[in-house]
Structures are given as C-alpha cells and as structure tokens.
C-alpha cells in the first residue's frame, strides 16, 4: 500500500472499479441462450403445415424474442441446413452462452457429430421437436442427441419454443 502515496488517486480509482464491477447492468445479468435450428426448418410455413403449422421460422423467432424478454433472457436464433455449421456453433457456444435449445430437425436421427459436440457443452441443453417424433415414422423415434440433452420437448408445435425457453429459465435459476 506504500505505492498508493505515490499515486494518490489510485485508491479512489480501485474503489470505484470494485464498486462498479459489483453493479452489473440488466443486460449483463441476462443469461444468453442460443436457439439452433437444423435442416429444412427455414421452410416452416411451407413444408408440411399439417404437421408443423403455418408459422414461419421468422414468426417463431419473433415470438421467442418477446417471450425471452419477459423471462429476462437474451437469445440468439440461428438456422442451418449444414451439419458442420451446427457443430461449429455448438462448439463456439461453450464460451458465449449459458444454455442451448436445439431443434436439430432430421439431424436428430442421424448425427453422431451433433451428439459429440453437445456432449462437451456441459450446460443446459433442451432438445426440441415441433412434432411428436414418437407418433411419426419409426425412423424418427430414435434421437442421437437426447443423450446429451437436459430435457426434451416434443409435439407442441411452435409453442414448444416458448416451453423450451421456460425450461431453460428454470434450469438456469437452479444454478
């Protein structure tokens, strides 16, 4: 502390920094959730509306943004038809997010690569399916990614995204 005599304003600066670090902004306090959407989900509203409904992915994203705001969550919404891109986003999310919501689409039933990426994430993961995969074709009954998920939501259509946000919020609140 003898050095403080040389820099008389240093103590005030250190005290101010410590106090300001203790007061984080509301945005900084928000948990960040990455919502990943796999192949063909960019075609929602057009593809099999009798199964998936008439909402587009943009409609769902808008609803999710509003719902996340009511929960105090910050979300980023992404979609890719490319398996490797989803894997990269999951790997990057380890450092930048607090939870994942994953609607892997058809990759659910085929991708060991997604399972491996999700297995190293080590934070809450909600697996999401708009349709009830167990009421559909036999090949859809198997999910490779379920083994890495904290929980699974399926069969609630576009409302499943809000349910997934609620689940993530509860998991994050538990710590």
What are the language-model segments listed below?
Residues 119-136:
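Short, acidic/small-residue loops that bind anionic groups at enzyme active sites
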Residues 39-41, 105-108, 131-133:
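Short glycine-rich anion-binding loops that position phosphate/pyrophosphate groups of nucleotides
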Residues 29-33:
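Extreme N-terminal starter segment of soluble prokaryotic enzymes
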Residues 74-84:
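Short beta->alpha junction loops
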Residues 44-58:
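Glycine- and acidic-residue-enriched helix-capping/strand-helix junction motifs
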Residues 111-121:
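Short Gly/Thr/Asp-enriched flexible loops that form oxyanion-binding sites at enzyme active sites
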Residues 135-175:
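Short, glycine-/small-residue-rich phosphate/pyrophosphate-handling segment
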Residues 93-100:
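Short acidic/histidine-rich motifs immediately flanking catalytic phosphotransfer sites
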